[in-house]
């Protein structure tokens, strides 16, 4: 007799349950957590791995090029690259003035921002500066020639040198490079601040009547200021300033002076060569 209070009146055991078949019921099979994460794209993964290497190489190259262009110090005219001319300028301190249109520059790339004058010391004294400066010639002007090799110089040569020294010696200047001349000097348009206004050094020499515009048929570097320079020269000439105060009959331009003295030197060399004493045996043969 079956138990009256059971869950079922039947004495048969319940049928065993079959395992759920997700495919039959139309459900997706269970997935692990890792399988749910997006799989990386192989090219993208390679790019991520090589990106730091690429950026490091590009950054190093950029830093090297920046150093070469802006922070490398040039110790002389011979070390300046040809691609700098007519494109770049150099900042530096004037260490000496040789005449009315030339001086020596100690290159200080980066200026005070690079520590020059407070972290990096500029050498002093001829021995410490030997081989460390750039010879600069002012573009577009020609100052009176000073005495050379025992020969007298031109009038106002000393005044021109003194004025240029007072104007730029031991001061910071910026030289806009044009070319390298036959004497390995850098021809440049030079500017300085006096005290806060930017001044063209060559132009100021012309205004004072202590230089003429450069006289040559070709190859003159003006820095785009030929008309400005010639106008300043004309004004100084009209006011009879400096060398323009010399009488017209006695005036000799720096170019004419150099041509004359160089011609005299050549004539003297020719005379000396023609009067060289003959060897004794030639004198004996020729009588």
Curated annotation (Swiss-Prot):
**Keywords assigned:** Calcium, Endonuclease, Hydrolase, Membrane, Metal-binding, Mitochondrion, Nuclease, Transmembrane, Transmembrane helix
Q: How does it sit in the membrane?
A: Single-pass membrane protein
Q: What is this protein called?
A: Probable endonuclease LCL3
Which GO cellular component term is one of those annotated? membrane
Active site positions: 137, 145, 185
Matching Gene3D superfamilies: 2.40.50.90
In this chain, Ca(2+) is annotated as bound at 142
Q: Where in the cell is it found?
A: Mitochondrion; Membrane
